[in-house]
Amino acid sequence: MSRVAKSPVEVPAAVTVTLNGQSLSVKGGKGTLALEVHANVEVKHEGNVLTFTPRDGAKQSDALAGTTRALVNNMVVGVSQGFEKKLTLVGVGYRVKAEGNTVNLSLGYSHPVNYVLPQGVSVETPSQTEIVLKSADKQLLGQVAAEIRAFREPEPYKGKGVRYSDEVVLRKEAKKK
């Protein structure tokens, strides 16, 4: 069995887990998330503990059990505490402004870049060069952050662009004459 799947997921008191056949839903203070569990993975809900075991001895089933356990753990943490990602804009004239569910970015192009956030993701802009994205869904949050970063990825010579706040951009030396 997968080493990840061996450890059970503990469910806090504020989180409700519902299991209908192979569909699992997790409800908490930050929202509700759902997951379709693969047929080769068996989920047991006993008290405030979820355990995941493969239905057969196949190697793929072991891997699926570990993956499912990790996804469900992220769902439980997401609906109870939530996740956040911070992005930083580096460059002269690079600005960000949040209006409702739209992020307006000025990234040195001849036009402003408007990004509409999907449902379930909220945004804050503490300053004109910082973006804080928050969501209960870790996968969706990472996807949104990657899409915003892709508008102007950090370049290696001056480091200009949109980067994650903890990202280290490897710098190159300019060409010598």
Swiss-Prot record:
Q: What is this protein called?
A: Large ribosomal subunit protein uL6
InterPro entries the record matches? Ribosomal_uL6-like, Ribosomal_uL6-like_a/b-dom_sf, Ribosomal_uL6_a/b-dom, Ribosomal_uL6_bac-type, Ribosomal_uL6_CS
The organism is Cellvibrio japonicus (strain Ueda107) (Pseudomonas fluorescens subsp. cellulosa)
Q: How does it assemble?
A: Part of the 50S ribosomal subunit.
Its biological function?
This protein binds to the 23S rRNA, and is important in its secondary structure. It is located near the subunit interface in the base of the L7/L12 stalk, and near the tRNA binding site of the peptidyltransferase center.
Point out the coiled-coil segments of this chain.
none
Which keywords are on file for this protein?
Ribonucleoprotein, Ribosomal protein, RNA-binding, rRNA-binding
Q: Name one GO cellular component term.
A: cytosolic large ribosomal subunit
